[in-house]
Amino acid sequence: MITLFNATMSRSTRVLWLLEELGADYELVPVSIRRPDGSGGADPANPHPLAQVPCILDDGELIVESLAIWVHLADSFPEARLAPGLGHPRRAEYVGWLGLATCVFEPLVIAALAGAPTDERQQAARSYLAQRLSAALDRHDWLLWDRFSAVDLIYGSLLRFAPDALGPLPQIDAWLYRMSERPALARVRQQEGRT
C-alpha cells in the first residue's frame, strides 16, 4: 500500500489527486510543513529528508519530489492509462512535459504567487509555456493526447494555484474547466475540506 504524507493545500495535493485518478489504495498521513507565510514547521512524522511534501512510501521505499513520484506512480498503474509506458513512442514527450512543469513552470508559479517581479528570462519562459499549452490544446482536449493524462494533472494543479500565470487564454480556460469537473478532483476537494 502507498502512504502519502499529506499537507493540505500543498504540493502533496497533486499527488493525492494522482492517486485518486489512478484508483490506487493509499493511506494518508497528515503532516505539518513550513508554509510560505512562516506558519507550520518540520513534522517528526514526515520522513522527507527536508521535511517537505510531497513524499510517499511505496512498499517501504521512500520516494520524494514530484517528478520522481509522478513517474513512479503512473508507471505502477498502467491500467489507468495516464502515461505512455516505457518504449511507447510518446514516452520522451511525456517525460519532457513533466520536466518542464517541475523545473520551469513551477518556479514561475511560485514567483507569481510571491508577487516577485518578472525578468526577461522568466517572461520568455512564460510566453513559451503559454504557446506550447495553447498549441497542444488546439489539437486535442488534453495536453498529451485525446484523453486526460498525468501531464494534464501536473499542469492543472499548478494553474489551480495561479490561474493567471500564463495570461488569459481561452483554450487553457476551457481545459481547466474540464479538469475541474473530474470526479477524482471532487474527491480530493472533499478530503481537504474544500468545495
Spans of model-derived segments:
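Exported/periplasmic ABC-transporter solute-binding proteins
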Residues: 191-192
